[in-house]
Amino acid sequence: GDRLYITAGVTAPTDSRHYPYCASWLDVEGRWTDLERPTKEGGWLSKHVTVFRDATSVVEDIFDSSHLFVTSGSHGVFEYRDGRLVNQYTQGNSCIESCSGSKSHDFVRTDAGIMDKDGSLFVANNSVDTVIWCRKPDGVWIPFFHEPVSKAGFFEKVIIDSKGRLWFANRRTDGNVSGGVLCIDYGQTVDNATDDVYTFRH
């Protein structure tokens, strides 16, 4: 598109660093626009979350540039329409999970968002059993479970190549999962797991 999107968050190995939630875009005329920030006052899980932080990636809907998704390193995925926050996908209202033993809403780690040609949104849900999830345009969530990367904590970057394959980069070794690159060839059929081919190189 004709926008440059940025986020100002990070997933720190020891939770030693965090940044206020910030997601913005730069248009062709050089103007910056900030997306609405989630607040307690706005009703976004105010009973559970203390401070919203760490926006990590922005995904523009390929069919509607006013429709965006923002992943965050602490609070799941946020959905926007016309710059306004309309939804949050997190522990309890979606398949995305918290990585903490107490299932705290402050540890719902998501990153590496991307959308395929059919409008299906892929995100990494780090440090849990099923790390890669797909949200179809109809709102149904589909798991992409691969045992060798289960509980990987640092899937932060992703691309889709010319053959429609997903390439996720795990930045560093974390527990039993090495840093490396995961390729998912799902045959561009998110509902059919029988043709999925996973390759993890580290």
Q: What positions do the PLM features span?
A:
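Carboxylate-rich, polar loop motifs that coordinate divalent cations or form catalytic acidic clusters
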Residues: 1-202
